[in-house]
């Protein structure tokens, strides 16, 4: 089965809602399982539970069929997203434009390559969909 991973902020920002809406559309179109991911940064000291994340998503979109909710802890959002995508065997990762910029900066530091989508496709063997902010 196709696997879609979408990282979001909690509480859901406007851009996270737009990114999540696109991920839900892709998952429904592909008959895919959707993993909604939030990353708790150690340095922020905040803890979000999976039930809080699920409740926020369902308040905005209603029940999402075939959805899984994950919360990871880490120092870097990018690293946690890569780990979740690899662990889930993601076929598609849907990220917001702001996240793409952060990923791009991280990749430049690591491999001096500004093409984050090509990097992720190579590393994760998946499609990357970037949702522009409106």
Predicted regions and their residues:
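Gly/Ser-rich helix-loop-strand patches that form or flank binding pockets
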Residues: 92-134
């Amino acid at each position: 089965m196709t696997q879609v991973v979408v990282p979001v902020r909690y509480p859901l920002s406007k851009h996270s809602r737009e990114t999540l809406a696109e991920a839900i559309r892709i998952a429904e179109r592909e008959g895919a399982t959707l993993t909604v991911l939030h990353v708790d940064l150690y340095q922020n000291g905040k803890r979000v539970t999976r039930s809080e994340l699920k409740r926020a998503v369902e308040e905005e979109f209603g029940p999402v069929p075939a959805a899984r909710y994950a919360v990871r802890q880490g120092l870097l959002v990018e690293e946690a997203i890569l780990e979740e995508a690899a662990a889930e065997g993601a076929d598609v990762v849907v990220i917001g434009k702001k996240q793409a910029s952060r990923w791009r900066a991280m990749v430049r530091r690591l491999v001096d390559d500004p093409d984050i989508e090509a990097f992720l496709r190579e590393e994760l063997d998946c499609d990357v969909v970037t949702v522009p902010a409106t």
